[in-house]
Design a protein with these regions (language model features):
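Conserved ATP-binding N-box helix of the HATPase_c
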Residues: 29-57
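Conserved beta-strand-loop-beta-strand hairpin that lines the nucleotide-binding pocket
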Residues: 1-4, 49-127
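Helix-loop-beta hinge of the Bergerat
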Residues: 2-30
Length: 127
């Protein structure tokens, strides 16, 4: 399994760069356009919720039909609460609902100093 590591500022100025990298990685695995877009949206939304201060590590593990993405450390506890708490109300659009729609699985891992890591997995459809 190949692995790619990236450290990026959380600043909004770098989100387009991250989107480009995520798209390139998914394209390498022959993901369909909508699958590429889904993975880009998941990472983008997660970074938007994380604020703009500091930096974050993003690692990508590339399988034959999947990308596992690990994002952190994130200091925004509201992310963990949104992903691990009760389901959103009908019609409420939050991070959890977005991730449930665009990735195949996600999870939250606790790290040192109260930070968290979020794990995302996107599978390529069989063709």
């Amino acid at each position: 399994m190949d692995r790619i590591e990236l450290t990026t500022p959380l600043s909004r100025d770098f989100r387009a760069v991250v989107r480009l990298i995520v798209g390139g990685i998914a394209e390498t695995l022959d993901f369909a356009f909508d699958e590429v877009d889904d993975l880009q949206l998941a990472v983008e939304r997660l970074l938007a919720e994380a604020g703009q201060d500091g930096s974050v590590n993003i690692s990508f593990q590339l399988g034959s039909r999947s990308v596992r993405t690990h994002v952190g450390p994130l200091r925004e506890r509201a992310i963990a609460d949104a992903l691990q708490g009760p389901p959103p109300e009908p019609g409420e659009l939050n991070l959890r609902r977005i991730l449930e729609a665009v990735v195949d699985s996600y999870g939250v891992e606790d790290a040192a100093d109260g930070a968290i890591y979020v794990r995302l997995e996107k599978l390529r459809e069989a063709r």
